[in-house]
């Protein structure tokens, strides 16, 4: 399993559009694809800190991620997303430890 993580800020003046997007075209976009195991979305509790949002997508494999990123429907939604956000960065993560109390 791999985790694709991306972080971003909503562009100033675009919050309402972003919220509309996240309830419309962007809603559950990842979960529509085979190979996605879980999606977690986080929002900063500190208000003005950057990044304001963080999304983690757990996938069965890198191949699943590649299939999603090249899907024409996903790419179309991604273009809309990038018109609403800034300071986008991403990472591919693999878990090395999980300790719980």
Residue ranges and their predicted role:
Residues 37-54, 77-101:
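Glycine-rich beta-strand-turn "strand-cap" elements at beta-sheet edges
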Residues 2-9, 40-72:
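Short, well-ordered beta-strand segments in beta-rich or mixed alpha/beta enzyme
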Residues 10-12, 59-61, 94-98:
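Non-catalytic surface loops within mature trypsin-like serine protease
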Residues 14-41, 73-81:
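Short amphipathic alpha-helical segments
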């Amino acid at each position: 399993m791999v985790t694709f993580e991306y972080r971003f800020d909503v562009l100033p003046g675009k919050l309402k559009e972003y919220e509309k997007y996240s309830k419309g075209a962007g809603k559950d976009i990842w979960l529509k694809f085979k190979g996605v195991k879980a999606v977690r979305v986080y929002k900063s509790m500190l208000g003005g800190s950057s990044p304001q949002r963080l999304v983690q997508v757990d996938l069965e494999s890198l191949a699943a991620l590649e299939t999603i990123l090249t899907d024409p429907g996903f790419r179309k939604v991604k273009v809309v997303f990038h018109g609403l956000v800034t300071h986008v960065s991403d990472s591919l993560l693999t878990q090395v430890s999980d300790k719980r109390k």
